[in-house]
Amino acid sequence: MILSPVTIWKKFDLTQALNAETEAETLTPAGFVAQNVRLDGHLLAGGGRVKIFARFTKPHGSEAAPALLLLPDADDDGAELADYFAAKGYATLIPDYCGRRGGKGTGKVTKSDTAANEADAAKEEEIAAEAEKIAAEENTDGGKRNYTVYPETADYANYEVSGAPAYLESESVENSAWMEWAYVALYALEYLKTRSDVSKIGVSGVRLGGEIAWMITLSPDISCAVIVNAAGWRSHLSAPKWGAASAAGEKSQDAGEEADAVRAFIAGVEAESYAPFVKCPVLMCCAMEDTFFDCDRAYDTFVRLGNPDGSGIVYSADSGKCIGPYALTDIDLFLERHLKGRHIYIPKPIELTVTESADGNLEMTAKTDEDALVKTLSVYYAEGRSGQVSSCRAWQRVKIVAGGEMKDNRFTCGCEPFSGAEYAFAYASAEFVNGFKTVSPVVGKRLKIKGGDCVKERVISAGEKDGFAVADYRAEALGGIFLEKESMPETIAGYGGITGVYSSAGIRTYRINSPRFVADDGAALKMDLYSKEDTSVKITVETSERGTGGEYSVIVPVAGGGKWKRMVLRAADLKDERTGGSLEDFSKGIAIVIRPENENCPVPVANVLWL
């Protein structure tokens, strides 16, 4: 049998009775009505059915409301997201697909040598904490468990057993976690269809939940899909799209060296395989610093969509691993069109070409949708090396123009690459007059001509927010994924009216990982800090591309009042948070993170540079 989304779908049996039970209505923290729902799911070959636990939340009002089948990430219960969408007028059903997640002393997330599972492993502590919370609720209602119960014969579907494997045994596709998770979502969809207080139905998934959402978008009962930080290609996370690692990965596939289990995963689970068969419009929201997926390949999945009309894609470059306020606006407009029937035009993505001239300079030309009115167009640029992880780029806006400055929906600008850079990257982003925002693919180009005019930069930041993103997003973000405007990096004034960059969630820059900004051997790090009262900040240099260790930190005091305080740090001043060892050299760094110890005491940062 040739494995594909079509053959997978032929295996789904949704004919079994739901036997749904709804419990007493309660109020959410935001005052919306919610109910626990229990229903029967997949009938296993050996007998016994999956017992699905879900949470239904509805907006105020007596009329039938459009609904979202909401699939959060594995470490989130979705409660905040349910309140967020209820306030927008949408009902939500959140089925638990994880089952047992693994609590303290029992967590067992399987790992492999793949980068996909390396990235997942970094979240184990968060998932274990959520598991403890769920475990505490298990027996609060007459012994009923507030999570999905998989029969013993389907123990592999429990997250504590499976993790999120980037492989699939083709001989036993029906006995896989991915198949069971999709079954949970599909039976939850069947339940939503039975409710008289629900009208149109969409699906939204975040990270792991987003990968599952791709698998069910083939259903004709789904009107639209919002996919967040999930674009497939997880089997390729160890092989970046541009560079030596990518070339090596492609060679091994051509030579037939890729394991059958990984081939099966690509064909039967990965979003890039499902996209051509999708029946509904899709909005892809991509946080460019999230290591769960490869943002470089997100557009590759988007262009494969079988139903592109009314679909869209948007990036968030400065909101860390979260979706920022521009993407939230896109989500609102997208759902209003496809679930509420409003006449909202969704512009087509931007076309972007990047060419290298004879003198080594770059020319970038962006072309927007001819049927949409552009408010502003921005072009972003970054430099890097071969095989670099896409989430570690220092994006910089090199040009912003008003729509009236464009001719025939086109705009061209130039850029002078740093002579030591191996690759140049660019993308364009446009905001339209109706509020919708869309982007181009990320274009990567190996630089062939080494110009000599560009010199290395000592100044990492003079105090502008360009190049900085939110560091610790989870405490600030709705559902750990939606970041609203007040948490974004901002410039605030200190002594003498001089401005610096600040966020209550801390700020991170990957500029020290860029060839243009990398530290010379033996360099010291200098920055100016300002505070109105005595406080302290934690300065961290991260040395791992995927955030799985290698954090060297120091806490420095900042005296309140007076002038800006100058801080100078040597590499040896920063200590490994696990071993206590000193940082060897700043040139080993991937990112600098600056966190306020007191989030109620703003500490702007300016004049970050190498000495």
Protein language model annotation of sequence segments:
Residues 15-62:
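N-terminal cap/lid segment of alpha/beta-hydrolase-fold proteins
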Residues 53-54, 64-73:
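Short beta-strand element of the alpha/beta-hydrolase
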Residues 187-243:
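Primarily recognizes the serine-hydrolase "nucleophile elbow" in alpha/beta-hydrolase
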Residues 278, 284-286:
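Short beta-strand/loop motif that positions the catalytic acidic residue
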Residues 337-381, 396-408:
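Surface beta-strand/loop "capping" patches
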